[in-house]
């Protein structure tokens, strides 16, 4: 039924295209919109790319093309259309910069997913300084470094960002890194915690670093605080590991693990 409706739609559009003088773009835009509404992304992309060839300056075609490229995670396509979006006043300079950063982050995350570390390094090095200093770009790059086992390179990048601002995401990543000077790393994280003592992410990070430093009693207290302000399955797991190291009872440890597992399986487990 849906296929027949789509075929009828296409035949009507072909007829309109053949009989409407000078309305190629209008008919093409309607066709692309209908294809998008039907989630026919590849067909819509082909239609819009053709329309761009026919009318390179058409602002609405450019806008639809950019939105579709973004939706399909075709980040190079987004970058290719950006200059025209600016020239045709579809986006102002701020919008162009935001979209450019989003596209660069998308490219870096795609390369990370493929474990294409050479491309990750290239994307990072070629990105403008302002883009590298953005939270989203830096967080994605830090994740990539951690996955490569290069956490020691990531640490200073997080610290430099945190000296100027705040990021729950980067604070969280800092707890997944272990630098050579663990005591200094812990002291730095505790300083951040003192400024944001009700933030579950910094509390989780400090708890992790205390555990790594074998300060288990303090780690337990901080992890319990983190759960108080923002319960997460991951935090319960860390707490259970600390309780195990402290020699707590099997019953107590199991109960904590169960709470964490229940939270992970529910839809209420907050994500960073």
Language-model segment annotations:
Residues 20-22, 56, 90, 131-132, ...:
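Short coil turns that delineate tetratricopeptide repeat
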Residues 9-13, 48, 81-82, 124, ...:
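Inward-facing hydrophobic residues that define packing positions of alpha-helical scaffold repeats
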